[in-house]
Swiss-Prot record:
Belongs to the fimbrial protein family. GO terms for biological process: cell adhesion involved in single-species biofilm formation. The gene is pmfA. Keywords: Disulfide bond, Fimbrium, Signal. Major structural component of PMF fimbriae. The lineage of its organism: Bacteria, Pseudomonadati, Pseudomonadota, Gammaproteobacteria, Enterobacterales. This is Major fimbrial subunit.
Length: 184
């Protein structure tokens, strides 16, 4: 009985002490919210495939190319890239071709795209299609077989002197080549 009274007294003391401590505590500061936004965009198209976001635009970075690499009409850089198509349905089309159109065709060598900005000169950009054939601007490339789901259309971009006797001036350059995928 004596033990019960002691236990009861201890419980009352600790309970009262807990209430007193809780009354003296300052409340924790309110944690603020983080707010953001999700922007959604796209286009619904009536075609065999859709263009993957990674392919609009396709970025080709040649980094630095020495002028000596362009001697004797050599093709320098030779960067392999893909135009990636998504959600392809081969019941709609079995193959695809690509037509490439530079924003400006090189004035000296019509097979090259011209630099549109930067201070480099005497050279331009060329492309080879999936069949390793030189791309003719505004002309369909060798057909590429589509597969259900993701299909990739490879190409190779290169830098080349405008002519065998062109004076290539070092400097930065940019070029733009648009493309259109057609399905068969």
């Amino acid at each position: 009985m004596k033990l019960s009274k002691i236990a009861l007294a201890a419980a009352l003391v600790f309970g009262i002490n807990s209430v007193a401590t809780a009354e003296n505590e300052t409340p924790a500061p309110k944690v603020s919210s983080t707010k953001g936004e999700i922007q959604l965009k796209g286009e619904i198209v009536n075609s065999a495939c859709g263009l993957a976001a990674s392919s609009s635009p396709v970025i080709v970075d040649f980094s630095e190319i020495p002028t000596s690499a362009l001697a004797n009409l050599q093709k320098a850089g030779n960067i392999k890239k893909d135009i990636e198509l998504q959600d392809c349905d081969t019941t709609v089309a079995k193959t695809a071709t690509v037509s490439y159109t530079p924003s400006v065709v090189n004035a000296v060598n019509k097979d090259l795209a011209s630099f549109v900005s930067g201070n480099a000169s005497g050279a331009g950009i060329g492309l080879m299609d999936a069949g390793s054939k030189a791309v003719k601007w505004n002309t369909a490339t060798t057909p590429v077989q589509l597969i259900n789901g993701v299909s990739k259309i490879p190409f190779v971009a290169y830098v080349q002197a405008e002519s065998a006797d062109a004076k290539v001036t070092p400097g930065e350059f940019q070029a733009v080549i648009n493309f259109q995928v057609d399905y068969q």
